[in-house]
Amino acid sequence: EVQLQESGPSLVKPSQTLSLTCSVTGDSITSDYWNWIRKFPGNKLEHMGYISYSGSTYYNPSLKSRISITRDTSKNQYYLQLNSVTSEDTATYYCTSLRFAYWGQGTLVTVSA
């Protein structure tokens, strides 16, 4: 069974960098595509980007100047970094597998001073 688990801070100050980790068990991150998704208050979903089995990345153009997705294959983890956050980045952040078959439980991140 594939399981994903997000971890990271629940509160980030404006202008700071948000860093999240997704730990994957039951599958290798070198054999699939791995997404970051966020759900805003009101339940609007946004696909932020992905990292592929080879390590190549895709970023949502609306975030491209602020986002980075990286990985550590030795830990079977991948990471989200979002720079210069504002209150509009307050959301529940999810890591998911290709075609969204498997989701983490999500982690709520609030951007506030």
UniProtKB/Swiss-Prot annotation:
Recorded GO MF terms: antigen binding
Record bears the keyword Ribonucleoprotein: no
A single BP term in Gene Ontology: immunoglobulin mediated immune response
Keywords from the named record: Adaptive immunity, Immunity, Immunoglobulin
Disulfide pairings: none
Gene Ontology cellular-component terms listed: extracellular region; immunoglobulin complex
Miscellaneous note of the record: This chain was isolated from an antiarsonate monoclonal antibody of the IgG2a subclass. It represents a second idiotype family characteristic of the antiarsonate response of strain A/J mice.
Protein name in UniProt: Ig heavy chain V region 36-60
